[in-house]
Amino acid sequence: MKQSHFFAHLSRMKLINRWPLMRNVRTENVSEHSLQVAMVAHALAAIKNRKFGGQLNAERIALLAMYHDASEVLTGDLPTPVKYFNSQIAQEYKAIEKIAQQKLVDMAPDELRDIFAPLIDENAWSEEEQAIVKQADALCAYLKCLEELSAGNNEFGLAKTRLEKTLELRRSQEMDYFMAVFVPSFHLSLDEISQDSPL
């Protein structure tokens, strides 16, 4: 049986730190971020289905979100100000991401490749799936800003403002619901979020 480096590469997601140009109270890695994006994307899909007449496969969307930054094990996490410095850099980075996604897919064993390819290759996602994962990705970055600001780290003030604009551009009914129901708790301390439901 031929060996595959697929999961050895994926396990390195935990070694790639996000927000590398900014001082962090708590460092966040790509593995942690991917789990949170998967949970939030699943919630957004479930909210859309339950409250707003959606027909999404919430479990598939959670899987897509789990793998949405997987190619960064080959490219690293390029800081947002660099990635979107101008349209040419953004376009070139998208091309690099596509190459990295394909390289990662090619590492999977032949008999499993058709399972992992549609999870890693964003071109295999529907527009609606892409939109939900992008919403969740932006929401999680926004939540990171709230956590850092709550811890007294003003370094994330401008990032929060930028992400508020991004969230407004990606706005949806399910995102509005999530923002109204779940986000306010991120401004509270552990004691405050625990007092209503003590063990």
Curated annotation (Swiss-Prot):
Superkingdom as given in the UniProt entry: Bacteria
Cited Pfam families: YfbR-like
Residues binding substrate: R18, W19, H33, D69, D77, L78, P79, T80, D137
Name under which the protein is recorded: 5'-deoxynucleotidase YfbR
EC identifiers of the protein: 3.1.3.89
Cofactor(s) of this protein: a divalent metal cation
Listed Gene3D superfamilies: Hypothetical protein af1432 (1.10.3210.10)
Gene Ontology CC entries for this record: cytoplasm
Site (Appears to be important in orienting the phosphate for catalysis) location in chain: R18
Keyword Hydrolase: yes
GO molecular function: 5'-deoxynucleotidase activity; metal ion binding; nucleotide binding
Keywords: Cytoplasm, Hydrolase, Metal-binding, Nucleotide-binding
PANTHER family named in the record: 5'-DEOXYNUCLEOTIDASE HDDC2
Job description of the protein: Catalyzes the strictly specific dephosphorylation of 2'-deoxyribonucleoside 5'-monophosphates.
Principal subcellular localisation of the protein: cytoplasm
Chain ranges of the HD domain: 30-142
Entry keyword Endoplasmic reticulum: no
Residue positions binding a divalent metal cation: H33, H68, D69, D137
InterPro entries, sorted: HD/PDEase_dom, HD_domain, YfbR, YfbR/HDDC2
Subcellular location, record wording: Cytoplasm
UniProt catalytic activity: a 2'-deoxyribonucleoside 5'-phosphate + H2O = a 2'-deoxyribonucleoside + phosphate
Subunit record text: Homodimer.
